[in-house]
Amino acid sequence: MEKCHERRLKLAEELKSCQKAFIALGDETRQQIIITLLESEVHGIRVGEITDKTHLSRPAVSHHLRILKEAGIVSMYREGTRNYYYVSAEETIWKQLGNLFSRINEIVDEISEKECSKSQIEIESNKDFI
């Protein structure tokens, strides 16, 4: 039982480390901005281009980009006075999310195996009543 509790604590810790990313990814408008960035040129696009493609106001796009940037999902580089935004290639947040989903998958598999075993035991014990 102790091992199970430790795994749940580790999962909670990993979930906390990904909270900003989940909040950022949980908004449909930000999802649309990410899709727009992924569909754009490799070098990134400017706020005005995102505004044109998403039909959002400049302040709205800037607000959502700030949240995505703070979450480590979007990066920006400056060329003169122009800012270009792109989906971040920094591995940290993507590795954290990948590790979290892997751990969730392991726990779900473990629970499924236990439920299958429990069902099998119930089937076996019900044979006595037939």
PLM region spans:
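Amphipathic alpha-helical dimerization/coiled-coil segments
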Residues: M1-C18, L38-E39, S88-I130
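Base-recognition residues in the alpha-helical recognition helix of bacterial helix-turn-helix
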Residues: I35, H63-H64
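Alpha-helical residues within the helix-turn-helix
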Residues: D52, H63, K69-E70
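Short amphipathic alpha-helical/adjacent loop interface patches that line ligand
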Residues: T54, L65, F101-I104
